[in-house]
Amino acid sequence: MLILAGLGLYDENDMTLKTLKFAKKAEKIYAEFYTAVLTGTTTEKIEEVLGKKIHVLSRKDVEYNGYKLIEEAKDKDIMFLTAGDPMVATTHVDLAIEAKKKGIEVLIINAPSIYSAVGITGLQLYKFGKTTSIVFPEENYFPETPYNVIKENLERGLHTLCLLDIRIDENEKRFMTANEGLKVLLELENRKKEGIINEDTKAVVVARAGSLKPKLVYGKIKDLINYDFGEPLHCIIIPGKLHFMEEDALKYLCENI
């Protein structure tokens, strides 16, 4: 059996009792921390809670050698752990599909993810439109997708969740800050010039969602862009049309600057 289980958002205390139960039954436990990462803990602390060794896989291991993991699950209980919810990343969905194709039983254990955690802002989840990702710009690479998604969502009165780039491999460990993400959005406006985003556009920044002390800050981009949000992970929300209760939530649940 292949067990796909989420670890939640922040530390080793976020995993469910169900994950703990099946981890104790699993013959081998794998994990990946390149699509998302728990910044409030370490692999060693998670191993201590589970009472078992975790074999951490790289992006290359999962994307090119994932079939080996599936082969093991033919006659063993194999657990694959991820930060957040296990079915958010398409790579994990692909593992589940391929296992099913081979007649292998698949158990999915859901967990808190950023998609549910943004509810701490008080913004109504059903009013979020398409999610987008803001990545680190590179030479000859400056994706316009975030700008286009925000534009489409705003036209429909919907909020936009902007996930920020994570770079984790053997040579690099880098998390995009909300400040960097906001600068990218302003640069996209400078290039596109469609009047969608400017320094007076209001945004919400969520830092360390899932922790006991998350940071929620609401204000204009010009005020947020130099604010110190502290340790990662960060995300940005561009609100759409606000219900009066959402306005109250942003006023009382977030720090207003």
Curated annotation (Swiss-Prot):
Which EC numbers characterise this protein's activity in its record?
2.1.1.98
The record describes its quaternary structure and partners as:
Homodimer.
Query: Which leading EC class covers this enzyme?
Result: transferase
Biological pathway: Protein modification; peptidyl-diphthamide biosynthesis
The organism is Methanocaldococcus jannaschii (strain ATCC 43067 / DSM 2661 / JAL-1 / JCM 10045 / NBRC 100440) (Methanococcus jannaschii)
Q: Which UniProt keywords apply?
A: Methyltransferase, S-adenosyl-L-methionine, Transferase
**Has the keyword Transferase been applied to this entry?**
yes
What are the coiled-coil residue ranges? none
Reaction catalyzed: 2-[(3S)-amino-3-carboxypropyl]-L-histidyl-[translation elongation factor 2] + 3 S-adenosyl-L-methionine = diphthine-[translation elongation factor 2] + 3 S-adenosyl-L-homocysteine + 3 H(+)
Looking up CDD domains in the UniProt record yields: DHP5_DphB
**Biological process per Gene Ontology, one example term:** protein histidyl modification to diphthamide
Question: Which Gene3D superfamilies does this one have?
Answer: Cobalt-precorrin-4 Transmethylase, Domain 1, Methyltransferase, Cobalt-precorrin-4 Transmethylase, Domain 2
**So which domain of life are we looking at?**
Archaea
Q: What is this protein called?
A: Diphthine synthase
UniProt function note? S-adenosyl-L-methionine-dependent methyltransferase that catalyzes the trimethylation of the amino group of the modified target histidine residue in translation elongation factor 2 (EF-2), to form an intermediate called diphthine. The three successive methylation reactions represent the second step of diphthamide biosynthesis.
Looking up Pfam families in the UniProt record yields: TP_methylase (PF00590)
> Is-annotated flag, keyword S-adenosyl-L-methionine?
yes
Where S-adenosyl-L-methionine binds, per the record, is at L9, D85, V88, S113, I114, L164, A209, H234
Question: InterPro entries, per this entry?
Answer: 4pyrrol_Mease, 4pyrrol_Methylase_sf, 4pyrrole_Mease_sub1, 4pyrrole_Mease_sub2, Dphthn_synthase
Family, per entry: Belongs to the diphthine synthase family.
